[in-house]
Amino acid sequence: MKITKIEKKKRLYLIEIDEAEHFYITEDTIVHFMLSKNKEILPEQLEEIKTFAQFSYGKNLALYYLSFKQRTEKEVKDYLIRHDINTTVISQILTQLKEEKWLDDSKYIDNILQQNLHSGDKGAFVLKQKLLQKGIESQLIEDMLKDFDFSSICIKTAQKLLKKYQSKLPKRALKDKLKQALTTKGFSYQEAQIALEDLDIENNSENEEELIYKELDKQYRKYSKKYENYELRQRLTQSLARKGFAFDAIKNALREYL
């Protein structure tokens, strides 16, 4: 069989065999096999050319995908599958990309940890879930997370949360809110507890008084339409207690309010 045409088509070349069969190849394929018009090739050579062409095309696709940002092995694999690259060829491409240091899931995890250390606010649990979603093996993630100290990140995050909620919640509710927010961000209960102990959460009687009367106004409008006297007082007491106010503060506020 003979190559009867080689025609450039944007980033690929269209090759024609015996004026009948057509398929696309990369420039690397032309160079590798020294292909040219009228060159005679054997059937087994044709299959080798096709396989190499898909490998070359797939690797170029992967490198293009990696040029935008760091990716995991699973992300690159899925990208190549979406572009109809043969699964056997994909395995070969991934192997070569790892050998050439274009792909490294361990380095990917380390970069995520360093970014989180310097500018993030997530604990180990949330980071693990995000890394799992990227297709990284659970054992590799756990091996790299187990020796990483999240305490400084937890304390820094707790300080930011304190500034956000301190003027909005009474002390008891504030501690519960901070602990809940920290565990939601992926920190362990122990890390959250240590971070809260490190914070300087002071009693602010003026702020708490302002908060309790503000909440009392709100709850009174809600319950006074349905209840009165003892039942109303009970409803207000229960509602304010759920908001984290101390019973002594609630009793004093109700004495003046009602």
UniProtKB/Swiss-Prot annotation:
Function noted in UniProt: Modulates RecA activity.
Pfam families: RecX_HTH1 (PF21982), RecX_HTH3 (PF21981)
Organism: Streptococcus mutans serotype c (strain ATCC 700610 / UA159)
Keyword Acyltransferase applies: no
Family of the protein in this entry: Belongs to the RecX family.
Protein's UniProt name: Regulatory protein RecX
InterPro entries the record matches: RecX_HTH_1st, RecX_HTH_3rd, Regulatory_RecX, WH-like_DNA-bd_sf
Superkingdom, natural source: Bacteria
